Swiss-Prot record:
Stored PANTHER family: LARGE RIBOSOMAL SUBUNIT PROTEIN BL34M, MITOCHONDRIAL RIBOSOMAL PROTEIN 34 FAMILY MEMBER
Keyword Metal-binding: no
Protein keywords: Ribonucleoprotein, Ribosomal protein
GO CC aspect terms: ribonucleoprotein complex; ribosome
Name of the protein described by the UniProt record: Large ribosomal subunit protein bL34
Assigned protein family: Belongs to the bacterial ribosomal protein bL34 family.
GO MF assignments: structural constituent of ribosome
One GO process term, biological-process aspect: translation
Pfam families given in the database record: Ribosomal_L34 (PF00468)
Amino acid sequence: MKRTFQPSNIKRKRSHGFRTRMATKNGRNVLARRRAKGRSSLSA
């Protein structure tokens, strides 16, 4: 049986990257929450 997690940096960046987050209002909300929480890394 094939495992569910098949890592790919391109897919990772496209779905969870900074520019993808900035592209939508909800994505910007995510970044704002992570900044407020004090995350050292905001996005993938």
